[in-house]
């Protein structure tokens, strides 16, 4: 489960804008995000709308400098949250981002920060032994049964990969044709 919003982050006299993601306790495992310090929140934290936060190294640097962030409180808009973990640096194909990233339990984000009762996204990771097409079909069927209509869309990483490969092949052919001319 996931929701996201941008918010003002305040520590002392420092106020910055950051990206807050409300996620489930399995988010870090599913996305392969590792912690450099502290811990991620657990199922109990999600159930009790805990005011706990995991931050990225960029957020730690901007808000706490070289000091220890664990146990410190960040005001996210007007919601105080205690830092329980700091992620490892995330490598991106697009370079390092200046975005300040924070993760809180999705229940906390929905109930205490956003005041709403619906999700933006659900991320599913399937076993290598399961067909992505079969998993997608089963998920669409389940969601349609639950919603009564198909009022959602599904993104499959295999479909994205195939599109990128097809585009790359087309561009290679185009460049080869230009070279021939």
Where is each model-derived feature located?
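Peri-transmembrane interface segments
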Residues: 138-139, 145-179
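Short linear capping/connector segments at secondary-structure termini
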Residues: 3-6, 46, 123, 157-160
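Alpha-helical transmembrane segments of multi-pass membrane transport proteins
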Residues: 17, 49, 128, 173-176
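Short amphipathic beta-strand/extended segments in non-transmembrane regions
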Residues: 1-40, 154
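Mid-to-C-terminal secondary-structure elements
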Residues: 21, 25-41, 49-148
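Residue-level detector of beta-strand face positions
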Residues: 8, 71-75, 153
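Short histidine/acidic/glycine/proline-rich micro-motifs that form metal-
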Residues: 6, 17, 126-130, 161
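A short acidic, helix-capping loop that chelates divalent metal ions and anchors anionic groups
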Residues: 7-11, 91-95, 161-165
């Amino acid at each position: 489960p996931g929701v996201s919003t941008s918010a003002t982050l305040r520590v002392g006299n420092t106020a910055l804008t950051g990206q807050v993601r409300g996620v489930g306790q399995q988010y870090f495992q599913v996305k392969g995000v590792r912690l450099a310090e502290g811990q991620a929140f657990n199922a109990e934290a999600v159930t009790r709308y805990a005011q706990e936060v995991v931050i990225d190294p960029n957020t730690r640097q901007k808000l706490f400098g070289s000091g220890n962030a664990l146990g410190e409180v960040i005001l996210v808009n007007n919601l105080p949250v205690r830092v329980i973990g700091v992620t490892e640096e995330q490598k991106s194909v697009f370079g390092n981002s200046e975005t300040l990233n924070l993760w809180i339990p999705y229940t906390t984000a929905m109930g205490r920060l956003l005041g709403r009762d619906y999700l933006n996204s659900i991320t599913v990771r399937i076993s290598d032994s399961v067909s992505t097409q079969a998993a997608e079909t089963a998920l669409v069927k389940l969601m349609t049964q639950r919603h009564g209509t198909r009022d959602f869309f599904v993104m499959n990483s295999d479909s994205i990969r195939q599109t990128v490969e097809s585009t790359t092949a087309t561009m290679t052919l185009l460049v080869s044709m230009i070279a021939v001319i």
